[in-house]
Swiss-Prot record:
It is found in: Membrane. The keyword Transmembrane applies. Its main location: membrane. It comes from the Eukaryota. It comes from Dictyostelium discoideum (Social amoeba). Keywords: Membrane, Transmembrane, Transmembrane helix. GO terms for cellular component: membrane. The chain crosses the membrane at residues 56-76, 273-293. Residues 177-198, 411-449 are annotated as: Disordered. This is Uncharacterized transmembrane protein DDB_G0294619. The keyword Cell membrane does not apply. It is a multi-pass membrane protein.
C-alpha cells in the first residue's frame, strides 16, 4: 500500500517561491534517513527558490493615462507570469526526477502539484510517496536539555549506507539553467555577502555556503494600519536549525536582541507633521502656498537624519558580529525587502542575513518532526557526536596555541641561559631577546583570551542528559 505525505512551502509573497522547510515527517522514519531527507530538501530549495518582480505599479500608471496601454501592459504581465511558472515547473520537475533516480532503492518518490487551477506558489504541495508494507521502526532516543532549557530528542547515529548527494550539487554548479535562476534570486545587499575576488566562482559559493534571513518585525506596523516609517527591530524567535553547528540558539537570540536594543527607535516628527498638516489646510484655502515648502523640507531632513543614524548603527553592529563569528566561517550582512527601498536608501524594511558554510561531513543535524508537538530532534552522523561543529574547531585552536606557547617558553629559557654565559653579546642579540620576550608575553596574553573563550563555550554547551 502506497501512502502520501503533503508538504506545503514556506510562506511567500506573490509569485515568489521560498522553498520548503526541513522539518522531518516522522512517517518516513522507516523509509528514508533524516540526513538524506534534509539533503533532498536542500537540493530542491537550491533549484527552485526564486523571486518574481511584478510590474503591477506600471500597469496602474498606464491605466491612468489610457485603456490601451493598460491592456498592453496586462497582456505582457500575463505572458511573463506564465513563462515564469512554466520555467519553475520545468526546473522543479527535473530536480525531482534526479532525486527519485538517486533514491529509488528507498522505495520513496517525490512529486509536486498545484492545488488550484490558478498556479499560485502558495498552493503548491510537495508530495512524498512511500511503501507502507515494510515494518515500522520505533523512534527511540534520549532527551537532552539545551542551554536554553529546550528538550531535544537525540536519535541514534545515521546509517552507514547513506546515498551520496554530492553529484547533484556538482551538476547544479555546471548547469546554465542554474545561472539563469541565480540572476532572478539576486538580493540587494548594502554590504557584500562574500568577499570574492573571482566573480566566475559564484556557483561554488552558493553550493558551499548557506544563508538564513532574519525578517524585520512587522507586527507593530500592521497594528497601526497606516504607513509607518519607524523601525521596530528584528524577530528573534525564528532560529534556523541549520545554524546549530555554527551558532547556538542563545547566541543567536543575544545577537538579535542587541541589534534591537541599538537600532529600535522612533522618528520624532510630531511638530513637522503638525506643521505639514496645518500648511496643507492653509494651502487648500490658498494661504499656505509658501509655508508648504519649508514644512516639506523640515520633514525630509528629519527623516533623512533618522535613517542616516539607523544605517550607521546597523553597519557598526554588522561589523561587530561579523568579527566575533568570523572564526566560525559566519558572515553577518543585511538586505532590504525590495529593490525600490534599496534605491531610495530610506526604508525600515530591513532583513539580517547570516551567511555560514554548509555543515561538514560528520557534524550532527538539528531539525524537528512535522507533528503537532514539533519536537526538536538531533541526529548524530557519527557516534556520540552531538556537540556543534564549531566547538571542535575551538578546542583544536586551543591545543595548537598551547603547543606554540610551550615551544616559545623553551626557546626563551634557552636564550636566557645563553645570554648569562656570554659576556660579550652585542646589541643585536639584546634586541632579539627582547623581541622573544615580547612574543612570549603576547602569546601568553592570547592564550589566556582563548582559554577564557573556550571555557565559556564549553560551559555554554554543558548539556544535561
Amino acid at each position: 500500500m502506497v501512502r502520501q505525505i503533503k508538504i506545503l512551502p514556506k510562506h511567500s509573497i506573490g509569485h515568489n517561491f521560498s522553498g520548503f522547510d526541513k522539518s522531518y515527517p516522522e512517517e518516513l522514519y522507516s523509509s528514508l534517513p533524516i540526513i538524506e531527507y534534509t539533503q533532498i530538501i536542500d537540493y530542491i530549495n537550491l533549484k527552485t527558490q526564486r523571486d518574481y518582480k511584478s510590474y503591477i505599479l506600471y500597469m496602474i500608471i498606464f491605466a491612468i493615462f489610457g485603456l490601451l496601454p493598460f491592456l498592453i501592459a496586462l497582456i505582457f504581465e500575463l505572458f511573463r507570469s506564465s513563462l515564469y511558472k512554466n520555467r519553475f515547473e520545468r526546473d522543479f520537475d527535473n530536480c525531482l526526477k534526479q532525486i527519485n533516480e538517486l533514491i529509488k532503492c528507498r522505495n520513496v518518490t517525490f512529486s509536486f502539484k498545484f492545488t488550484s487551477k490558478i498556479r499560485k506558489m502558495q498552493k503548491l504541495e510537495l508530495i512524498i510517496s512511500y511503501q507502507d508494507e515494510q515494518p515500522k521502526k520505533e523512534i527511540v532516543g534520549d532527551f537532552i536539555v539545551s542551554p536554553e532549557g529546550r528538550n531535544i530528542l537525540v536519535l541514534p547515529p545515521a546509517p552507514l549506507d547513506l546515498i551520496n548527494f554530492d553529484q547533484l550539487y556538482l551538476s547544479s554548479s555546471q548547469s546554465n539553467k542554474f545561472n539563469k535562476s541565480k540572476k532572478s534570486n539576486k538580493i540587494n545587499d548594502k554590504t557584500p555577502i562574500l568577499n570574492n575576488n573571482n566573480n566566475n566562482n559564484n556557483n561554488n559559493n552558493i553550493i558551499n555556503y548557506c544563508k538564513t534571513k532574519i525578517n524585520y518585525n512587522n507586527s507593530e506596523r500592521k497594528t497601526n494600519g497606516l504607513k509607518d516609517d519607524n523601525f521596530y527591530g528584528f524577530k528573534d524567535t525564528n532560529y534556523d536549525k541549520d545554524l546549530y553547528n555554527f551558532m547556538l540558539e542563545s547566541e543567536y537570540q543575544s545577537m538579535i536582541r542587541e541589534f534591537n536594543t541599538v537600532l529600535v527607535r522612533k522618528i520624532d516628527i510630531k511638530k513637522q507633521l503638525i506643521f505639514l498638516l496645518v500648511s496643507t489646510i492653509l494651502l487648500i484655502a490658498l494661504i499656505g502656498f509658501i509655508l508648504i515648502i519649508p514644512a516639506a523640507i523640515l520633514y525630509s531632513k528629519k527623516r533623512s537624519h533618522y535613517y542616516t543614524h539607523l544605517y550607521n548603527d546597523l553597519n557598526i553592529m554588522v561589523h561587530k558580529y561579523s568579527s566575533i563569528y568570523n572564526s566560525r566561517g559566519i558572515t553577518i550582512s543585511y538586505c532590504f525587502e525590495n529593490s525600490d527601498d534599496f534605491n531610495n536608501d530610506s526604508s525600515p524594511l530591513i532583513n539580517i542575513l547570516i551567511i555560514y558554510p554548509k555543515a561538514p561531513k560528520g557534524s550532527p543535524i538539528l531539525t524537528n518532526f512535522t507533528n503537532n508537538t514539533h519536537q526538536w530532534i538531533l541526529v548524530p552522523t557519527s557516534p556520540n557526536a552531538i556537540a556543534p561543529y564549531f566547538t571542535i574547531l575551538n578546542n583544536m585552536a586551543y591545543n595548537n596555541n598551547n603547543s606554540i606557547i610551550e615551544n616559545n617558553f623553551n626557546n626563551n629559557y634557552n636564550n636566557s641561559n645563553n645570554n648569562n654565559n656570554s659576556n660579550n653579546s652585542n646589541s643585536n642579540n639584546n634586541n632579539n631577546n627582547n623581541n622573544n620576550n615580547n612574543n612570549y608575553n603576547n602569546n601568553n596574553y592570547n592564550n589566556n583570551n582563548n582559554q577564557v573563550q573556550v571555557y565559556q563555550t564549553e560551559q555554554t554547551l554543558n548539556y544535561n542528559i
